[in-house]
Regions:
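Conserved Nudix-box catalytic region and its N-terminal flanking loop in Nudix hydrolases
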Residues: 4, 46-56, 62-69, 73, ...
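Acidic, metal-coordinating catalytic segment for phosphate/diphosphate chemistry
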Residues: 81-122, 128
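Short clusters of small/polar residues that mark proteolytic maturation junctions
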Residues: 99, 113-114, 137, 186, ...
Protein backbone atom coordinates (compact mmCIF):
# COMPACT_ATOMS: atom_id res chain seq x y z
CA UNK A 1 0.00 0.00 0.00
CA UNK A 2 2.84 2.38 0.90
CA UNK A 3 4.44 1.73 -2.49
CA UNK A 4 1.16 2.54 -4.24
CA UNK A 5 0.88 5.79 -2.26
CA UNK A 6 4.45 6.73 -3.26
CA UNK A 7 3.67 6.09 -6.92
CA UNK A 8 0.47 8.09 -6.71
CA UNK A 9 2.35 10.91 -4.97
CA UNK A 10 4.98 10.93 -7.71
CA UNK A 11 2.26 11.05 -10.35
CA UNK A 12 0.58 13.95 -8.54
CA UNK A 13 3.90 15.80 -8.30
CA UNK A 14 4.58 15.29 -12.02
CA UNK A 15 1.07 16.43 -12.84
CA UNK A 16 1.58 19.52 -10.70
CA UNK A 17 4.85 20.32 -12.48
CA UNK A 18 3.14 19.82 -15.84
CA UNK A 19 0.32 22.15 -14.84
CA UNK A 20 2.84 24.76 -13.66
CA UNK A 21 4.76 24.55 -16.93
CA UNK A 22 1.51 24.90 -18.84
CA UNK A 23 0.63 28.00 -16.82
CA UNK A 24 4.09 29.49 -17.45
CA UNK A 25 3.77 28.77 -21.18
CA UNK A 26 0.35 30.38 -21.21
CA UNK A 27 1.71 33.44 -19.43
CA UNK A 28 4.55 33.72 -21.94
CA UNK A 29 2.06 33.46 -24.79
CA UNK A 30 -0.07 36.18 -23.19
CA UNK A 31 3.00 38.41 -22.71
CA UNK A 32 4.03 37.82 -26.32
CA UNK A 33 0.53 38.62 -27.53
CA UNK A 34 0.47 41.82 -25.47
CA UNK A 35 3.91 42.83 -26.75
CA UNK A 36 2.85 42.10 -30.33
CA UNK A 37 -0.29 44.18 -29.89
CA UNK A 38 1.77 47.04 -28.47
CA UNK A 39 4.14 46.87 -31.44
CA UNK A 40 1.24 46.85 -33.89
CA UNK A 41 -0.30 49.86 -32.16
CA UNK A 42 3.06 51.60 -32.24
CA UNK A 43 3.59 50.85 -35.93
CA UNK A 44 0.08 51.99 -36.78
CA UNK A 45 0.62 55.25 -34.94
CA UNK A 46 4.09 55.64 -36.36
CA UNK A 47 2.99 55.29 -39.97
CA UNK A 48 -0.36 57.06 -40.04
CA UNK A 49 -3.23 57.97 -37.75
CA UNK A 50 -6.37 58.07 -39.85
CA UNK A 51 -7.80 57.49 -43.31
CA UNK A 52 -5.36 58.25 -46.11
CA UNK A 53 -8.28 59.43 -48.23
CA UNK A 54 -8.64 62.37 -45.84
CA UNK A 55 -5.06 63.58 -46.28
CA UNK A 56 -5.06 67.25 -47.21
CA UNK A 57 -1.31 67.64 -47.64
CA UNK A 58 0.83 66.40 -50.50
CA UNK A 59 4.53 66.65 -51.24
CA UNK A 60 4.08 68.40 -54.55
CA UNK A 61 6.39 68.24 -57.54
CA UNK A 62 10.17 68.17 -56.97
CA UNK A 63 11.82 71.59 -57.05
CA UNK A 64 15.09 72.19 -58.90
CA UNK A 65 17.19 74.37 -56.61
CA UNK A 66 20.53 74.67 -54.87
CA UNK A 67 21.23 72.33 -51.97
CA UNK A 68 19.90 73.75 -48.69
CA UNK A 69 20.99 72.17 -45.40
CA UNK A 70 20.32 72.73 -41.74
CA UNK A 71 17.48 75.04 -40.72
CA UNK A 72 17.90 77.47 -43.60
CA UNK A 73 14.87 76.29 -45.59
CA UNK A 74 11.67 78.06 -44.44
CA UNK A 75 9.59 75.18 -45.84
CA UNK A 76 10.89 72.89 -43.09
CA UNK A 77 8.40 74.40 -40.64
CA UNK A 78 5.59 72.74 -42.59
CA UNK A 79 6.97 69.23 -41.96
CA UNK A 80 8.33 69.50 -38.41
CA UNK A 81 6.83 67.55 -35.51
CA UNK A 82 6.45 68.90 -31.98
CA UNK A 83 7.36 66.51 -29.12
CA UNK A 84 4.68 66.38 -26.42
CA UNK A 85 6.06 63.72 -24.05
CA UNK A 86 8.80 61.10 -23.86
CA UNK A 87 8.96 58.00 -21.67
CA UNK A 88 11.48 55.17 -21.42
CA UNK A 89 9.82 52.07 -22.85
CA UNK A 90 12.82 49.74 -22.51
CA UNK A 91 16.29 50.00 -20.99
CA UNK A 92 19.20 47.98 -22.35
CA UNK A 93 22.91 47.60 -21.73
CA UNK A 94 23.90 49.74 -24.73
CA UNK A 95 20.81 51.74 -25.66
CA UNK A 96 17.29 52.62 -24.53
CA UNK A 97 14.04 52.66 -26.45
CA UNK A 98 11.90 55.71 -25.70
CA UNK A 99 8.30 56.28 -26.71
CA UNK A 100 7.41 59.81 -27.79
CA UNK A 101 4.02 61.40 -28.25
CA UNK A 102 4.30 64.01 -31.00
CA UNK A 103 2.08 66.55 -32.67
CA UNK A 104 2.15 66.38 -36.45
CA UNK A 105 2.20 69.52 -38.64
CA UNK A 106 -1.55 69.18 -39.23
CA UNK A 107 -2.35 68.98 -35.51
CA UNK A 108 -2.92 65.24 -35.23
CA UNK A 109 -0.98 63.18 -32.67
CA UNK A 110 1.25 60.17 -33.31
CA UNK A 111 3.60 57.82 -31.46
CA UNK A 112 7.30 57.54 -32.28
CA UNK A 113 9.51 54.81 -30.82
CA UNK A 114 13.11 56.06 -30.79
CA UNK A 115 16.33 54.24 -29.96
CA UNK A 116 18.47 56.50 -27.76
CA UNK A 117 22.14 55.66 -28.33
CA UNK A 118 25.27 57.37 -26.91
CA UNK A 119 26.93 57.47 -30.33
CA UNK A 120 30.02 55.83 -31.76
CA UNK A 121 33.29 56.37 -33.57
CA UNK A 122 34.80 54.61 -36.59
CA UNK A 123 38.34 54.76 -37.91
CA UNK A 124 39.70 54.51 -41.45
CA UNK A 125 43.24 53.36 -40.64
CA UNK A 126 45.46 53.88 -43.69
CA UNK A 127 49.00 52.47 -43.79
CA UNK A 128 51.91 54.12 -45.57
CA UNK A 129 51.60 51.39 -48.21
CA UNK A 130 48.01 52.36 -48.99
CA UNK A 131 46.29 49.53 -47.16
CA UNK A 132 43.18 49.84 -45.01
CA UNK A 133 42.75 48.07 -41.69
CA UNK A 134 39.55 46.00 -41.54
CA UNK A 135 38.11 43.89 -38.74
CA UNK A 136 36.16 40.69 -39.23
CA UNK A 137 33.66 39.97 -36.47
CA UNK A 138 30.39 38.13 -35.94
CA UNK A 139 27.35 40.40 -35.81
CA UNK A 140 24.53 38.72 -33.93
CA UNK A 141 21.87 41.03 -35.36
CA UNK A 142 22.74 39.91 -38.91
CA UNK A 143 23.68 36.36 -37.99
CA UNK A 144 26.97 36.39 -39.89
CA UNK A 145 30.55 37.64 -39.93
CA UNK A 146 30.96 41.14 -41.35
CA UNK A 147 33.94 43.09 -42.67
CA UNK A 148 34.16 46.61 -41.23
CA UNK A 149 36.49 49.43 -40.34
CA UNK A 150 37.32 49.51 -36.60
CA UNK A 151 34.61 51.15 -34.50
CA UNK A 152 33.13 51.36 -31.03
CA UNK A 153 30.55 53.16 -28.98
CA UNK A 154 31.14 56.31 -26.97
CA UNK A 155 30.77 56.44 -23.23
CA UNK A 156 28.55 59.36 -22.12
CA UNK A 157 30.54 62.60 -22.27
CA UNK A 158 33.57 61.00 -23.94
CA UNK A 159 35.53 63.02 -26.50
CA UNK A 160 35.10 61.30 -29.90
CA UNK A 161 38.73 61.88 -30.89
CA UNK A 162 39.98 60.17 -27.73
CA UNK A 163 37.48 57.36 -28.28
CA UNK A 164 38.77 56.86 -31.84
CA UNK A 165 42.33 56.47 -30.59
CA UNK A 166 41.17 54.06 -27.88
CA UNK A 167 39.07 51.90 -30.20
CA UNK A 168 41.83 51.69 -32.81
CA UNK A 169 44.25 50.36 -30.20
CA UNK A 170 41.75 48.01 -28.56
CA UNK A 171 40.54 46.38 -31.77
CA UNK A 172 43.67 46.37 -33.93
CA UNK A 173 46.65 47.00 -31.68
CA UNK A 174 47.53 50.10 -33.71
CA UNK A 175 48.48 53.58 -32.59
CA UNK A 176 48.31 56.53 -34.97
CA UNK A 177 50.68 59.43 -35.45
CA UNK A 178 47.76 61.50 -36.72
CA UNK A 179 43.99 61.16 -36.47
CA UNK A 180 41.86 63.54 -38.54
CA UNK A 181 38.10 64.00 -38.50
CA UNK A 182 36.30 63.03 -41.73
CA UNK A 183 32.56 63.26 -41.16
CA UNK A 184 29.61 62.32 -38.96
CA UNK A 185 26.80 60.06 -40.16
CA UNK A 186 23.41 59.16 -38.73
CA UNK A 187 23.34 55.37 -38.75
CA UNK A 188 19.56 54.99 -39.09
CA UNK A 189 17.77 58.27 -38.44
CA UNK A 190 14.32 56.83 -39.10
CA UNK A 191 14.23 55.40 -35.59
CA UNK A 192 17.63 55.89 -33.92
CA UNK A 193 19.58 58.98 -32.79
CA UNK A 194 23.00 57.32 -33.02
CA UNK A 195 25.68 59.47 -34.64
CA UNK A 196 28.91 57.84 -35.83
CA UNK A 197 31.96 60.10 -36.01
CA UNK A 198 34.39 58.85 -38.66
CA UNK A 199 38.12 59.58 -38.49
CA UNK A 200 41.15 58.83 -40.65
CA UNK A 201 44.25 57.50 -38.90
CA UNK A 202 47.73 57.63 -40.47
CA UNK A 203 51.30 57.14 -39.28
CA UNK A 204 50.35 53.75 -37.88
CA UNK A 205 52.47 51.67 -35.53
CA UNK A 206 51.61 48.17 -34.39
CA UNK A 207 51.36 47.24 -30.73
CA UNK A 208 49.06 44.78 -28.94
CA UNK A 209 45.28 44.75 -29.21
CA UNK A 210 43.04 44.55 -26.13
CA UNK A 211 39.47 43.87 -27.27
CA UNK A 212 36.55 43.70 -24.88
CA UNK A 213 35.99 40.38 -23.13
CA UNK A 214 33.10 39.50 -25.45
CA UNK A 215 34.82 40.64 -28.68
CA UNK A 216 36.42 38.09 -31.01
CA UNK A 217 38.06 39.82 -33.97
CA UNK A 218 40.35 39.04 -36.88
CA UNK A 219 42.25 41.96 -38.44
CA UNK A 220 43.17 42.33 -42.13
CA UNK A 221 45.11 44.90 -44.14
CA UNK A 222 43.71 45.24 -47.66
CA UNK A 223 44.40 47.53 -50.60
CA UNK A 224 42.22 50.66 -50.55
CA UNK A 225 41.31 50.11 -54.21
CA UNK A 226 40.16 46.57 -53.44
CA UNK A 227 37.95 47.81 -50.60
CA UNK A 228 36.43 50.51 -52.82
CA UNK A 229 35.67 47.91 -55.50
CA UNK A 230 33.90 45.78 -52.87
CA UNK A 231 31.87 48.81 -51.77
CA UNK A 232 30.85 49.75 -55.31
CA UNK A 233 29.73 46.24 -56.28
CA UNK A 234 27.72 45.76 -53.09
CA UNK A 235 29.89 43.25 -51.24
CA UNK A 236 30.38 45.68 -48.34
CA UNK A 237 27.07 46.56 -46.67
CA UNK A 238 28.23 48.18 -43.44
CA UNK A 239 27.30 51.87 -43.68
CA UNK A 240 30.26 53.36 -41.81
CA UNK A 241 32.68 51.27 -43.87
CA UNK A 242 31.04 52.35 -47.13
CA UNK A 243 31.26 56.03 -46.18
CA UNK A 244 34.77 55.76 -44.75
CA UNK A 245 36.16 53.90 -47.77
CA UNK A 246 34.69 56.32 -50.32
CA UNK A 247 35.84 59.38 -48.39
CA UNK A 248 39.34 58.00 -47.99
CA UNK A 249 39.47 57.15 -51.70
CA UNK A 250 38.26 60.64 -52.64
CA UNK A 251 40.84 62.30 -50.40
CA UNK A 252 43.62 60.09 -51.79
CA UNK A 253 42.70 60.99 -55.37
CA UNK A 254 42.59 64.71 -54.56
CA UNK A 255 45.98 64.57 -52.84
CA UNK A 256 47.49 62.72 -55.79
CA UNK A 257 45.96 65.22 -58.22
CA UNK A 258 47.38 68.15 -56.23
CA UNK A 259 50.84 66.56 -56.16
CA UNK A 260 50.72 65.96 -59.92
CA UNK A 261 49.82 69.62 -60.53
CA UNK A 262 52.79 70.76 -58.46
Amino acid sequence: MADIQKVNGAHDEQAGETDELAVQASLREDELADATADMRDSVASFTFDGDRDDVDHVSGAPVERELVLGSEDPRDASVEERPLSEDVAWTGRIFNVNRLQVELPDGRHAVRDVVRHPGAVAIVALTDEGRICLVRQYRTALGRVTVEIPAGKLTPGEDPLEAASRELLEETGMTAGKIAFLTTIASSDGFCDELIHIYMATGLEFSKSSPDADEFINVDLVELSELVDAVLDGRIEDAKTVVGALLCDSISHRLNFSQEEE
